[in-house]
Amino acid sequence: MKAIIVLLMVVTSNADRICTGITSSNSPHVVKTATQGEVNVTGVIPLTTTPTKSHFANLKGTKTRGKLCPNCLNCTDLDVALARPMCIGTIPSAKASILHEVRPVTSGCFPIMHDRTKIRQLPNLLRGYENIRLSTHNVINAERAPGGPYRLGTSGSCPNVTSRSGFFATMAWAVPRDNKTATNPLTVEVPYICTKGEDQITVWGFHSDSKTQMKKLYGDSNPQKFTSSANGVTTHYVSQIGGFPNQTEDGGLPQSGRIVVDYMVQKPGKTGTIVYQRGVLLPQKVWCASGRSKVIKGSLPLIGEADCLHEKYGGLNKSKPYYTGEHAKAIGNCPIWVKTPLKLANGTKYRPPAKLLKER
């Protein structure tokens, strides 16, 4: 393969004799120069390498995050992001994060209609922050929210440490206690409660079911309307009544209904609003997140350390300044991608052996 010359050294002599020339043999090194085209030289130093695929690793000198919550056993990153019971734990701070769930599976609490919202992006949104923590307090009093009083619904698929049924800590399933009637759109303000100037990620949603179940739970079997607004972003939804698609990825959860889950990002001091009818999942604990973590697609487990993390090759140690092969996103102390190999000429321009001449 042709290479581009980086440096070419030329040696001259001011001797008063014509000698036999440069002692050399056939040179296998051909470099391509800007002024002389292809040139044979007596020696080169390769500047490029072609990596092979390897395990992903921890980035040297930097905290690297794989799973959002390494100590939350049998929990997907979506479980952690929604704060499913038994999946609440400390998320370690990190300057680099591995996006290892290309299509995050649903949580085991309740069948989620993923395609209606951007909820699959929530774990990746959190992964992009260096510091992430779940608030200790609820953002609103769900039981006394407009349209209440409410009892908080639970799911037998969500047992917690104290009960055989529960629900996500980020949301409250608002089921009317007594006033099971249709309602006009109601509005609740969502205050900013993070304390360190972080972004506040507020999770909310709504539940829908068959006409029979909607009438039983909420007193209204018609489609319900919902709107969220924060940081200049407004989102509208209308609930679907029955006719839900089969979601085999839910692992055979028994519920007949579905929930739609979304989130909004609130900047420091900014209030959000949710306009809702029956079946709302009101926000409770919120995520407080700050700093930036570089995110790269990869896989787990993380084995050892590496200078560079590359989406196609995994963990790389930088042995040369350039590399050839597949070009993809990389983070860390990485070699630079080039299309063709580069070589540094560390010898002279090759000349064939000169014939022996007489002295003058």
Swiss-Prot record:
Post-translational events: In natural infection, inactive HA is matured into HA1 and HA2 outside the cell by one or more trypsin-like, arginine-specific endoprotease secreted by the bronchial epithelial cells. One identified protease that may be involved in this process is secreted in lungs by club cells.
Q: Does the entry feature the keyword Lipoprotein, yes or no?
A: yes
Q: Which Pfam families match?
A: Hemagglutinin (PF00509)
Any idea which UniProt keywords this protein has? Disulfide bond, Fusion of virus membrane with host endosomal membrane, Fusion of virus membrane with host membrane, Glycoprotein, Hemagglutinin, Host cell membrane, Host membrane, Host-virus interaction, Lipoprotein, Membrane, Palmitate, Signal, Transmembrane, Viral attachment to host cell, Viral envelope protein, Viral penetration into host cytoplasm, Virion, Virus entry into host cell
Q: Name the glycosylated positions.
A: 40, 74, 160, 179, 246, 317, 346
InterPro entries associated with the record: Capsid_hemagglutn (IPR008980), Hemagglutn_HA1_a/b_dom_sf (IPR013828), Hemagglutn_influenz_A/B (IPR001364)
Q: How does it sit in the membrane?
A: Single-pass type I membrane protein
Q: Where in the cell is it found?
A: Virion membrane; Host apical cell membrane
Give the highest taxon in the source lineage: Viruses
Query: Residue span of the signal peptide, if any?
Result: 1-15
- BP GO terms, sorted: fusion of virus membrane with host endosome membrane; fusion of virus membrane with host plasma membrane; symbiont entry into host cell; virion attachment to host cell
Q: What is its main location?
A: virion
- Is Ligase set as a keyword in this record? no
A Gene Ontology molecular function term for this protein is:
host cell surface receptor binding
GO cellular component term, pick one: viral envelope
Job of this protein: Binds to sialic acid-containing receptors on the cell surface, bringing about the attachment of the virus particle to the cell. Plays a major role in the determination of host range restriction and virulence. Class I viral fusion protein. Responsible for penetration of the virus into the cell cytoplasm by mediating the fusion of the membrane of the endocytosed virus particle with the endosomal membrane. Low pH in endosomes induce an irreversible conformational change in HA2, releasing the fusion hydrophobic peptide. Several trimers are required to form a competent fusion pore.
This protein's assembly is summarised as: Homotrimer of disulfide-linked HA1-HA2.
Q: Any extra detail in the entry?
A: Major glycoprotein, comprises over 80% of the envelope proteins present in virus particle. The extent of infection into host organism is determined by HA. Influenza viruses bud from the apical surface of polarized epithelial cells (e.g. bronchial epithelial cells) into lumen of lungs and are therefore usually pneumotropic. The reason is that HA is cleaved by tryptase clara which is restricted to lungs. However, HAs of H5 and H7 pantropic avian viruses subtypes can be cleaved by furin and subtilisin-type enzymes, allowing the virus to grow in other organs than lungs.
As for family, the record states: Belongs to the influenza viruses hemagglutinin family.
Name of the protein in question: Hemagglutinin
